[in-house]
A protein has these predicted regions:
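Charged, amphipathic alpha-helical linker segments immediately N-terminal to NTP-binding catalytic cores
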Residues: 1-34
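Switch/coupling segment of Walker-type NTPase motor domains
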Residues: 27-141
Length: 141
């Protein structure tokens, strides 16, 4: 159930000053940052990000800049904050642009390419339980 008691008749976009007060500033050129999250506004070198636990749903037509304007800055802020990442990247764009940066920062990059399985890494979800079973540890397998 939604609690709508905080909603007023006035609905508007936040001003730049309000955004700067509310969100965390991230400088992509520094090695470490205070926050990681989805960019609300960005100049390219810096951004104000929503580092709350809120979910984000990004919608846009093909070629509208979802990857370049939202996902790339989000990924970079997570790298700078040393966050763990699982990235769904069906076209391989983020992998293509961020792979070297991730490795440079010490990330282990695993690529599961379901379109071309021989090209990427492989993952067998039954491998670990199979090893446990073969060792006689059937209760954990």
């Amino acid at each position: 159930m939604v609690n709508a008691t905080h909603i007023t008749e006035e609905v508007r976009f936040e001003s730049e000053e309000e955004i700067k007060d509310r969100y965390t500033e991230v400088n992509f050129e520094s090695e470490k940052v205070k926050g990681a999250g989805v960019p609300v506004i960005s100049t390219g070198r810096t951004a104000y990000v929503d580092d709350s636990e809120a979910s984000t749903f990004v919608v846009g037509a093909s070629g509208s800049g979802k990857t370049r304007k939202v996902l790339m800055p989000y990924t970079l802020s997570c790298i700078r904050k040393n966050e763990n990442l699982v990235i769904h990247d069906p076209k391989g764009e983020i992998n293509r642009y961020m792979y070297r940066e991730l490795e440079k920062e010490g990330y282990e990059v695993i690529v599961l390419d379901y379109r071309r399985p021989l090209r990427g890494d492989r993952y067998n979800p039954l491998e670990y339980p199979s090893k446990l079973y073969k060792k006689g540890n059937t209760s954990r397998a």
